[in-house]
Amino acid sequence: MAKPKILIIVENLPVPFDKRVWKEASSLHQNGYDVTVLCPRGKGYEQGHEVIGGIHVYRHPMLKEANSGFGYLCEYGWALFWEFLYTCWIYLRRGFRVMQGCNPPDLVFLIALPFKLLGIKYIFDHHDASPELYFSKFGKKGVVYKIQVWLEKLTYRFSDVVMSTNGSYRDLALTRGGLDPEDVFIVRNGPDLRTFTPVPPNPALKHGKPYLIGYVGTMSIQEGLDILLDVALHIKNLGRRDIHFTCIGGGPELARLRKMTQDKDLEEMVNFTGRIPDKQLVEILSTADVCVNPDKPCEMNDISTMIKIMEYMALEKPIVQFDLKEGRFSAQGASLYADRRSQVTDFASKILWLIEHPAERKRMGNLGRRRVQEELAWEYSVDNLLAAYARVFTKWDWRSSRRRSTDPRATSHGRLDEARPST
């Protein structure tokens, strides 16, 4: 029997660099689906087409990441143009019965619309709350913000099933989107413990200091890296010269952050690696004594789950972060939570406290690792991923061939008691 064919479209990152999308594609392939992924090209991922582990990956041309309203208009328009052309070609060449669109932005449903007329079903994989994301970047609720709200509503309107990364995003789908609870599934973005596991620390990575503070994520002000630099400066002003900060990752403001580091005279205390291979990333974080998440307190960060938190936990690292709803849900006792009001000083004091209490660092690290192993690892998300696809295939209805009752995905995963969302 032919495998059910699906197409996954992601606009903002290449695959397999986008870890969530790659884990989804791999898990679906391993469970009997014929998977094709369409994504942009990026540094290190310039090949237009390749087959990786049985998964066809197509990459379209992409403009440089935008940082203005006009820039976003050009970037998204360019992406939609190529996505539509590639999708038409993939449909004619390989075929697909379900399309999965990953945001941001909330625009992939536009690619799905003409194919829905052919009976194709659409799954919305909700990575980021776009209205909140826009406001966190620009602090405005003008015309562009209202367009984001409108596009989100349309995305929900034309989605047959929604996959949310956490309970807060599921609530958005139920309240702002008005979806049936049976059509919304929580698929958390936990680390894959088969590949993301601690390695022995390498003292050479501590830059000659006794203690290393680790960070991984996107290099942008929105991620709170400016706060982290102020934290490092505060620690330096306290007379500490025994602590080094290593920040891992690429992003639109990497050059600006390096310049800020230079301006604050922190070059001997802070370094930015840029984007590096996962093996090197894991070695640095495994060497770190404390890992940090300086995401700024705001509505976007409050309702979002950051994969870095669970990666730190998987590597048995104690964490310092601000007290945010989903961050606390993920880390629980594996983290200390800095006061939102006294951002820099309290964040710094939490780091210093952990530095001075190695037994507590070990206890918190063990607690975090155990929580990931028992609840948050990617393996616990696969069941809901499969349930979401089982649900959408029960809705699939091809006008020339009524397959709803015979599709293997529907019969093996389609019962409501097996496909119900979990929290």
Could you describe each region identified by the protein language model?
Residues 88, 107-118, 143-162:
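Membrane-proximal helix-turn-helix segments that form the acceptor-binding/catalytic region
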Residues 7, 205-232, 246, 385:
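Conserved donor-binding/catalytic core segment of Leloir-type glycosyltransferases
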Residues 353, 360-375, 384-387:
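A short, well-ordered alpha-helix in the C-terminal region of glycosyltransferases
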Residues 1-45, 49-57, 404-408, 412-423:
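N-terminal subdomain of nucleotide-sugar transferases
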Residues 248, 255-282:
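Nucleotide-activated donor-binding/catalytic signature segment of Leloir-type glycosyltransferases, i.e.
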Residues 168, 190:
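Carbohydrate-associated surface elements
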Residues 223, 279-284, 293-313, 320-333:
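Nucleotide-sugar-dependent
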